[in-house]
């Protein structure tokens, strides 16, 4: 399954900021994602808004939870199941709610 991870943090907890910098944060996050076995499809960053977005693929809830642990340590994490838009359109057509 695909999941969208939306992780936010405050200015005060920003690992790339000046108040509580963590120069190893991206390495920790990369290690955590790889160790968990979760496949990172893509990642995005809204630096001024202090928000990360990741699209990941996994069928293992425990692995998903382990993958995002570094993000939880600096802020809040929301995980939602998603599907590719093209797959959603095909599904909607198949069940008759779209032409």
Language-model features and meaning:
Residues 35, 57-89:
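An amphipathic, aromatic/His-enriched active-site/gating alpha helix that lines ligand/cofactor pockets
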Residues 8, 55-57:
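Short hydrophobic/aromatic beta-strand micro-patches
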Residues 1-35, 39-50, 62, 85, ...:
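Short S/T/G/P-rich N-terminal loop/turn motif that feeds into the first structured element of a domain
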């Amino acid at each position: 399954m695909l999941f969208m991870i939306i992780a936010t943090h405050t200015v005060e907890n920003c690992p790339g900021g000046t108040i509580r910098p963590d120069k190893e944060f991206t390495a920790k996050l990369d290690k955590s994602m790889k160790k968990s076995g979760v496949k990172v499809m893509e990642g995005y960053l809204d630096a001024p808004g202090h928000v990360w977005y990741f699209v990941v693929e996994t069928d293992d809830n425990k692995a998903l939870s382990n993958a995002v642990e570094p993000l939880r340590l600096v802020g809040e994490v929301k995980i939602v199941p998603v599907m590719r838009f093209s797959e959603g359109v095909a599904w909607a057509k198949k069940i008759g709610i779209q032409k």
